[in-house]
Amino acid sequence: MRFSNLVTALTALLGAQAAAAVGDERDQLVKRASLTQVQNFGDNPSGIKMFLYVPDNLPENPAVVLVLHACAWTAEAFFGTTRYGQLADEHGIVLVFGQTPNDGDCWDVSSDQTLTHDGGGDSTGLANMVRYALDEYNGDPSRVFVTGESSGAMMTQVMAAVYPDLFAAASEFSGEPAGCFYTGTVRGWNSDCAGGQVQRTAEEWAATVRDMYPGYDGEYPRMQVFHGDVDTILHINSFNESVKEWSGIFGYDGTPLETLENNPGASLTKYIYGDRLQGIWGHGIGHVVPTNETEALTWFGIL
């Protein structure tokens, strides 16, 4: 498996998800206006693109949500196949969509730059997008969140690790633990990580996270992890290793305190490890677990 295989799989997924958005068991998708591109939002060393969706009914001090696409997707495509626009209109949320220029439209989750606080990679540009939105719309700095699918899910975990002071919570769909995909190169493919062969203790994973922001001693964002049990793109061990990583950060022992069947929906089981960590296991679901916007925003405390 290489990025080319991942891109091919996600291109097919994009078509299927777009078709499903026309009419499925979820609330009917209502077409929203297009995103607005922001050209100058601060330091942007890797040349990523920023797009905004700002509802007309914006309250004072709105929440800000960073949304990150999968490989082979664009910001506009992801926006058009999710309900985030509808929910932003209903609840007064500023949506920030990033878009990477990397080959295959995959986020850099593997280089030293992106895995270092203000290190000059994709993560630096994304952090500055969020800061721009906070300043421009007087956003509430205590209600800043990040979510994404696949490559965007990997970057979601990276952002939570590299910029823990910026985000209150994260929700990722079919990603990898922060730092698992490290190669030292931009957009490097880590076969060991993708194949489920990178296995560490909770303490080792926690040290990996803390090394991304040396000297930081504050809280880390609450984490919600989705993964499917027949994922052949990113091994199902990714779920267990992600749970270990964030259990190590939060001081949990990795044993669920509560197990909820068919929650938040059919074929899903929710494991609650503490008030700062949830894992949601998709039975018979491959890559990726479809974005559940309502569940993510509920985890964020917006709904």
Task: For every predicted segment, state its role.
Residues Q99-G121, G184:
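Cap/lid segment of the alpha/beta-hydrolase catalytic domain
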Residues L58-D105, V289:
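Short substrate-entry loop that stabilizes the transition state in hydrolases
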Residues R2-V64, E76, T82, E90, ...:
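A domain-start/cap signature at the N-terminus of enzymes
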Residues A153-D165, S171:
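Short glycine-enriched nucleophile-adjacent loop
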